[in-house]
Structure formats: C-alpha cells, structure tokens
Design a protein with these regions (language model features):
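Short, compact, well-ordered microdomains
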Residues: 65-111
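N-terminal disorder-to-order initiation segments that are Gly/Lys/Arg-biased
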Residues: 1-55, 94-111
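Short alpha-helix capping/helix-loop boundary micro-motifs
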Residues: 54-64
C-alpha cells in the first residue's frame, strides 16, 4: 500500500465532511474525497458562464475498467447532501494518477 493510499484512507476515515460519491452513468464510486465544490456564475459579453472549482480524489482500484477520461461528464454527491437532489454535474478537465490515487480536476458543464 502506497503512502498516498494510506493518507487517503486516513483522511476518509477521520474527516467525514470530505467524503463524496462519484456517479459515472450507472456506475457509482462510493469512496472518494472532495474538499468542496465552489460554483460561480459570471456575466460576460457572450452571456452567462458557469464555472466550478473542485478536485475529487479516488482510489485507482475503484476507477472503472475504462478509466475516467478527460471530457467525461460525472456527478458528485458530497457527504450529507440529499441523494435525490444533491448530485452536481461536472466535466473532467484533467486526470492525474499518482501513487494509487486518481485526482480529477473538474470544470463546469456548459450545455
């Protein structure tokens, strides 16, 4: 077990507010970490743009067989949110595998 994996498991066990779930289609990854999801909507000359400031970390072993690719739309449910209405959509802007973990940098879904 790598240092990163041990740290992930320790944080997951001790800081319950940082826990989240990730949903990719019908697949749900129940054990993930997220420090929070910051949402911002700003007015520009082109109209309103939404942005999200968030990073999500999960164990590489929990990642689906066909790894989560950049551009994939996922949903995140932070600990304590309603399971019916609390899911937040985000697009994977970057994927960074390190020491048994995968970090996903998220951005807004502008549809």
């Amino acid at each position: 077990m790598s240092f990163e994996t041990k740290a992930f498991n320790s944080i997951y066990a001790s800081i319950t507010i940082a826990r989240c779930q990730i949903r990719i289609g019908r697949t749900v990854i129940a054990k993930a970490l997220c420090a929070g999801i910051g949402k911002l909507r700003e007015n520009t000359d082109e109209g309103q743009l939404g942005s999200i400031d968030a990073n999500v970390r999960l164990l590489a072993t929990d990642e689906p067989d066909d790894e989560i690719k950049t551009g994939t739309v996922i949903e995140i449910l932070q600990n304590g949110q309603d399971t019916k209405t609390g899911w937040v959509k985000a697009r994977v802007g970057g994927r960074f595998p390190v020491g048994g973990l995968t970090r996903l940098a998220l951005e807004a879904v502008n549809e």
